[in-house]
Amino acid sequence: MKQPSLDILLSKVDSKYTLVLAAAKRARTLMEDPEFEVNYRGSKPVSLAFDEIAKGKYHFELTREGIK
C-alpha cells in the first residue's frame, strides 16, 4: 500500500501534531478490533490510519479534552 503524501494529510488537519494524535488514536482502535489480523493481514495500523485520514474515512473532533 502506498503512503499518502504529507501535503494531503496536512490538508485534512490544522497541524502536524493533530495529525499524529488522530493517527495514533485510530491505530489504537484498529488494534483493539479482534478481527484486525484477519481483515488487514500484513498492514500496519498506523499506515492504515494515515490512509483513512487522507481518504476522509476517519473523522475526528478536536476538543479541549483531546481528540474524539
Curated annotation (Swiss-Prot):
Q: What class of enzyme is it?
A: transferase
The source's domain of life comes to Bacteria
GO BP terms: namely: DNA-templated transcription
| Cross-referenced InterPro entries | DNA-dir_RNA_pol_omega (IPR003716), Pol_omega/Rpo6/RPB6 (IPR006110), RPB6/omega-like_sf (IPR036161)
A Gene Ontology term for the protein's cellular component: DNA-directed RNA polymerase complex
The alphabetized UniProt keywords are: DNA-directed RNA polymerase, Nucleotidyltransferase, Transcription, Transferase
The EC number of this protein is: 2.7.7.6
Task: Name a GO molecular-function annotation.
Answer: DNA-directed RNA polymerase activity
Q: Which reaction does this chain catalyze?
A: RNA(n) + a ribonucleoside 5'-triphosphate = RNA(n+1) + diphosphate
Q: What exactly does this protein do?
A: Promotes RNA polymerase assembly. Latches the N- and C-terminal regions of the beta' subunit thereby facilitating its interaction with the beta and alpha subunits.
Stated family? Belongs to the RNA polymerase subunit omega family.
Complex and partners: The RNAP catalytic core consists of 2 alpha, 1 beta, 1 beta' and 1 omega subunit. When a sigma factor is associated with the core the holoenzyme is formed, which can initiate transcription.
For this entry, the protein name equals DNA-directed RNA polymerase subunit omega
Gene of this entry:
rpoZ
